Amino acid sequence: MKIYIYTIPKAGTYFLADFIARLGFSNTGFHVSQKSFLDTAAFDLETNARFPSKTKQKQLFYRTLTRMSDGELAFGHFPVPLMSWMFPDFYFVCAYRHPRRTLVSEFIDFRFRRADIAWISRDSIADDRQAFCAYLLRHGQAHMTIFSQMLGVTMLLNEPLCRRFQHERTHLLNFDRFLQGPEGALALAEALGVDPALAPEALEATRAAETKTKATDLKVDRTALWNDEAEDIYARLDAEAFVQRGRELGWDI
């Protein structure tokens, strides 16, 4: 069995990859997109966090995934589960999170960690709140498009007539709930066919590890970013409608 971790950005992509690797799977480090992948395992943490574009390799997703070996995992925001029948030897771990959390987290990643996104840098926009509004205007819709694709995956899983989408090869989770206690880790380990007794230690080891975009040294007042302008832009994204639809589909969000 191979594993593809499909996430909304900032919903535990690298955290889940690290955790699952500690359960006995091999992390390729492939961050998969449609026509390329980031070869994160071939570069150090500094390069991955600040200059991820340097790790980019051109290759169609199908080629990247089908070349993987049994027991390996890859990850990304590209909706491979929408084509799950093309990958019968894959198990899909799908992780979502509330957009108020993912939007802020991705903004912080773009502004404070990455050094290859000039339009959102502190040199370009001095005030953090203005920069957050600029991020929401320029990138918010793209972010919510990925959210909508996760909704699409869930809708197909919930539809009994869509027999190509097999429940037994998909595990859906809320990343914030996953972090709250061992129950989520135990459930994921069991879903992957791993002894659940291994999960608590693996989870604590991953918590202590430095993964690619974990905010361990950034002090940002996230609440203060939500000024009136940011709230107005957020409302225009219809993000809460996405959240409500997720709840209707059974999401714990």
Task: Write out the residue ranges for each language-model feature.
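An amphipathic alpha-helix signature
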Residues: 100, 182-186, 239
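Generic structural signal for hydrophobic residues
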Residues: 16, 20, 184-188, 233, ...
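A solvent-exposed, charged loop/short amphipathic helix patch at secondary-structure junctions
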Residues: 110-141
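Phosphate-binding beta-loop-alpha motif at adenosine-nucleotide cofactor sites
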Residues: 165-191
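PAPS-dependent sulfotransferases, especially Golgi type II membrane carbohydrate sulfotransferases
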Residues: 1-2, 160-164, 192-253
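Non-catalytic, well-ordered alpha-helical segments in soluble enzyme domains
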Residues: 24-26, 184-198
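Short amphipathic alpha-helical segments that mediate assembly, nucleic-acid/protein binding
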Residues: 57-61, 129-133, 143, 230, ...
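PAPS-dependent sulfotransferase catalytic domain
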Residues: 1-119, 145-168, 172
